[in-house]
Swiss-Prot record:
Residues 252-262, 343-354, 599-610 have a biased composition (Low complexity). Residues 389-543 are annotated as: Interaction with VP16. Signal peptide: none annotated. This is Mediator of RNA polymerase II transcription subunit 25. Residues 233-273, 298-390, 548-746 are annotated as: Disordered. Keywords: Activator, Methylation, Nucleus, Transcription, Transcription regulation. The modification Asymmetric dimethylarginine is found at R724. Belongs to the Mediator complex subunit 25 family. Residues 563-652, 639-706 are annotated as: Interaction with RARA. The lineage of its organism: Eukaryota, Metazoa, Chordata, Craniata, Vertebrata. Component of the Mediator complex, a coactivator involved in the regulated transcription of nearly all RNA polymerase II-dependent genes. Mediator functions as a bridge to convey information from gene-specific regulatory proteins to the basal RNA polymerase II transcription machinery. Mediator is recruited to promoters by direct interactions with regulatory proteins and serves as a scaffold for the assembly of a functional preinitiation complex with RNA polymerase II and the general transcription factors. Required for RARA/RXRA-mediated transcription. It is found in: Nucleus.
């Protein structure tokens, strides 16, 4: 445990990135349920700030992100060594992922591919860092759960960390400030060595003995960056108190092992009355044999995903107080067939990837909520009937609390020439509450004004979201265009902040409108701490603008430092129009070849710079997708192959006021009527910002004929191998597109 890093409970404003790296082999399967109950679920509850609940809509915009990596052994071929689940902000959904792991294979192996799992986890943390640019540093924790030492093999499946050994990977984890923890049912010296090597360089903490937090003397629990309950009996959600661990070798015949399932739900209790001298693996083997007999007898289903279905059964309470996952209890034949509405975790535990298409069942809005996590895009116009129908059905058992009009402003979908043009939309809406709740809406105004906020800015307000009452918004589809626009905006990374005017004598000052992509409904959160929530929004917006200012300054500095020796003055001249453009014109997706002098000069379009779809993250205009700003052009691989280009490099023309950048004057070097050439495959998207005003070779010669293969010069190393300089950053989108909204809020 890191001394002084955490208190006994979770800090209120903790924003964490959590990755569980789990061995998905049969070597861990018999012990996983005990580890899950005593260590994994308390850890999830620590980061979540409370027990995971399916109705926690604040998790969609809350701070903590969870991700799951499952690795195997070398005998899993031809399957991939690692299965990675897309990040989710819902702790409830993350628990369903844990319940859906199939522990198979690895019986003939004494080691596991820990290096593959850790290399994938490091790539996840790299992605988290890009996602978290708006809020800065987060609390990052990597938890390894395994029951075997690592192979002495480097990682091969990871693109970024290929060739790194397990020890190298844990050292990288420690150097990057990621807290590394290990949970294992056995005390393995190789795993303890990994834990020691993952210590941050500046942290020389004494290791606490594992017995302080372990629930079983055989377990090895080494944790950093989180707090687990000490001793037995404090694990959340057990149906009965934890049985005492039989420390002497000869235990009474009725004693049970702590890793064996102890719940009285299954109707075969005789398999739990085992002698105390049997190991946990033997107990699990007996359970598996008994379950196999029951399956052959037709008493239970023949597939293992019965566990996610049992986890999703309503009315049981917390998701971790149900049937143990290490055995399949033979229930009645109709048991694994609950109605579809009670199966929210079925799809998400099978393949939670971002590439899954939304379900095409317009008549089943309850199943539409089972879209795999990561699919956060708004519904297509053809599917708008399903959410509207689902909203009507879901409010039938609620009370109408308020009826009026919701108004908001958005930018027109076809980008207008005038950046200040806004489209005002309004929709009739109703607010519903549950039976027994009293929401005083008599003083609410007839029209509510909503302002859009990028949901990335709300990640630090997760505790305030949880400490709020929940109402449901229902919109009538009289204005279909406005309804489509609302679904499109709210489903693509925005939340609505509804301000109540000070003239209205109501106790509510701010209300957050959130769209749940899983439930397909609009939820309104009314924080109990109104003043704290308003101050929190102001604070995150202020921090956001400071971060953006720092990034712009860093990019200007980086662009000047990374220029090749002869390009300093050229880069400075090119930076000026880019900066002016950043202040004057927001990025607009434009078709190829329609930007003034670029089209006139035959300026080519960079590969991969097609106009971005609406809602796609766009960087600053100097690096935005679409035609580059006038001035920089793509640079050929070897400037020395063309003497005219070489002389242009050495003697750049001085910039003149009121004259377009030099590519128009250099147009005579290209044959008239020549079509624009595409850049070579090695050309990166970020290179137009660094290259001087250069030309492409005439189309009569191909790239290989014009530029024969030769060794790269030292100066060219800076311009190859991917984007350099001011490249588009996903986190820079709100700085240009939503500045007016943020200023209104401040």
């Amino acid at each position: 445990m890191v001394p002084g890093s955490e208190g006994p409970a979770r800090a209120g404003g903790l924003v964490a990135d959590v990755v569980f790296v789990i061995e998905g082999t049969a070597n861990l399967g018999p012990y996983f349920e005990g580890l899950r109950k005593h260590y994994l679920l308390p850890a999830i509850e620590y980061f979540n700030g409370g027990p995971p609940a399916e109705t926690d809509f604040g998790g969609d915009y809350g701070g903590t992100q969870y991700s799951l990596v499952v690795f195997n052994t070398v005998d899993c071929a031809p399957e991939s060594y690692v299965q990675c689940h897309a990040p989710t902000s819902s702790a409830y959904e993350f628990v369903t992922w844990l319940d859906g792991i199939k522990f198979m294979g690895g019986g003939g192996e004494s080691c596991s591919l820990i290096a593959e799992g850790l290399s994938t986890a490091l790539q996840l943390f790299d992605d988290f860092k890009k996602m978290r640019e708006q809020i800065g540093q987060t609390h990052r924790v990597c938890l390894l759960i395994c029951n075997s030492p690592p192979y002495l093999l480097p990682a091969v499946e990871s693109t970024t960390y290929s060739g790194c050994t397990t020890e190298t990977l844990v050292q990288k984890i420690g150097e990057r400030g990621i807290y590394f923890s290990i949970v294992s049912p056995r005390k393995l010296p190789a795993l303890r060595l990994l834990f020691e090597k993952a210590a941050p360089p500046a942290m020389l903490e004494p290791l606490q003995p594992p017995a302080d937090v372990s629930q079983d003397p055989r377990h090895m629990v080494l944790v950093r960056g989180l707090v687990l309950p000490v001793g037995g009996g404090s694990a959340p959600g057990p149906l009965q108190p934890k049985q005492p661990v039989p420390l002497p070798p000869a235990a009474p015949a009725g004693a049970t092992l702590s890793t064996a399932p102890q719940q009285p739900l299954p109707p075969v209790p005789q398999q739990y009355q085992v002698p105390g001298n049997l190991s946990a693996a033997q107990v699990a083997a007996q359970n598996a044999v008994e379950a196999a007999k029951n399956q052959k007898a037709g008493l239970g289903p023949r597939f293992s995903p019965i566990n996610p279905l049992q986890q999703a059964t309503p009315g049981v309470g917390p998701p971790y107080s149900q049937t143990q996952a290490t055995q399949l209890p033979p229930g009645p034949p109709g048991a694994p067939k609950p109605p579809p509405a009670s199966q929210p975790s079925l799809v998400s535990t099978v393949a939670p990837g971002p590439g899954l298409a939304p379900p095409a069942q317009p008549g089943a809005p309850s199943m539409a909520g089972t879209v795999a996590p990561g699919g956060v895009s708004g519904p297509s116009p053809a599917q708008l009937g399903a959410p509207a129908l689902g909203g009507q059905q879901s409010v039938s058992n609620k009370l109408l609390a308020w009826s009026g009009v919701l108004e908001w402003q958005e930018k027109p979908k076809p980008a207008s020439v005038d950046a200040n043009t806004k489209l005002t939309r309004s929709l009739p809406c109703q607010v519903y509450v549950n039976h027994g709740e009293n929401l005083k809406t008599e003083q609410w105004p007839q029209k509510l004004i909503m302002q859009l906020i990028p949901q990335q800015l709300l990640t630090t307000l997760g505790p305030l979201f949880r400490n709020s009452r929940m109402v449901q918004f229902h919109f009538t589809n009289k204005d279909l265009d406005s309804l489509k626009g609302l679904y499109r905006i709210m489903g693509n990374g925005f939340a609505g902040c509804v301000h109540f005017p000070h003239t209205a004598p109501c106790e509510v000052r701010v209300l957050m409108l959130l769209y749940s992509s899983k439930k397909k409904i609009f939820m309104g959160l009314i924080p109990y701490d109104q003043s704290g929530f308003v101050n929190g929004i102001r604070q995150v917006i202020t921090n956001h603008k400071q971060v953006q200012q720092q990034k712009l300054e860093q990019q200007r500095g980086m662009g000047a430092q990374q220029a090749p020796p002869g390009l300093g003055p050229i880069l400075e001249d090119q930076a000026r129009p880019s900066q002016n453009l950043l202040q004057l014109r927001p990025p607009q997706p434009q078709p190829q070849g329609t930007v003034g002098a670029s089209a006139a000069a035959g300026q080519p379009q960079p590969q991969g710079a097609a106009p971005a779809p609406p809602g796609a993250p766009q960087g600053p205009p100097g690096a935005a997708p679409g035609p580059p700003p006038p001035g920089p052009l793509l640079r050929p691989q070897n400037p020395g192959a063309n003497p005219q280009l070489r002389s242009l490099l050495l003697n750049p023309p001085p910039p003149q006021t009121g004259v377009p950048p030099p590519q128009a004057s250099l147009h005579h070097l290209q044959p008239p009527g020549a079509p624009a050439l595409l850049p070579p495959p090695h050309q990166g998207l970020g290179q137009p910002q660094l290259g001087p005003p250069l030309l492409h070779p005439p189309p009569a010669q191909s790239w290989p004929a014009q530029l024969p293969p030769r060794a790269s010069l030292p100066g060219q190393m800076l311009l190859s191998g991917g984007p350099r300089g001011p490249v588009p950053q996903p986190g820079l989108q709100p700085s240009v597109m939503e500045d007016d909204i943020l200023m209104d809020l401040i």
